[in-house]
Amino acid sequence: ARNIEKLKDLKKEIKAHLIKCDVTNIKSVTNLFKKTDKIVGAPNLVIYNPSKSLGGNIIDLDPKKAYEAINITCYGGFLVAQQAAKRMLKKKRGSIFFTGATASVKGFPKSSVFAMGKFGLRGLAQSLARELHPQNIHIGHFIIDGGIGRENYGSYKTIHPDSIAKIYLEFHYQDKSAWSWETELRTSVEKF
């Protein structure tokens, strides 16, 4: 995260290490992995979650903000995957997962920038799956089709974060004879 202050409670809860990182900066991403190497070694699983949404009419969008949003949503995924793959290829195993959205497969009005970033991230994941699966690196892309939250859990209006985490782990442990590269997650009441 760029701002690790908001994660301090989570750090205590799950006994995690916090490392500040700007995913759009090559040096920052390289430093993240070098620090991780020293703390816990080469990762077995890397999940890329960052994204930035920018909505609005195409004629009103600020090009600089659009550039930043696409860099965070997509280019950062490339930088993180590159560093993760370098380490995993040496170990001859690992998983790299990307968190997508409905916008990964369907553009909506006034969401062109978000769709560009998520479409690009999905394309990256699909290409990497074809490149790295034969080398025992599992690539996954997860289309999160709905809001995420703990509230309204019984009504299934949002996807519970613990349920998402469970699916990610199940995907990580898929048998090599039945690997998939993409899955969609939505509540039972979400229209699609």
Regions found by a protein language model. Give the residues of each.
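The beta1-alpha1 cofactor-binding region of Rossmann-like NAD(H)/NADP(H)-dependent oxidoreductases
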Residues: 4-5, 20-32, 63
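A glycine-rich helix->loop->beta "capping" turn
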Residues: 14, 35-48, 54
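Active-site loop of short-chain dehydrogenase/reductase
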Residues: 42-43, 57, 88-101, 134-137
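Catalytic Tyr-X3-Lys loop
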Residues: 44, 52, 59-78, 97, ...
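Helix N-cap/beta-alpha junction loops of NAD(P)-dependent oxidoreductase domains
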Residues: 51-57, 105-108
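A short, exposed helix-loop element centered on a Lys and neighboring polar residues
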Residues: 81-82, 126
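Catalytic loop of short-chain dehydrogenase/reductase
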Residues: 95-120, 126, 130-133, 143, ...
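C-terminal helical subdomain
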Residues: 134-192
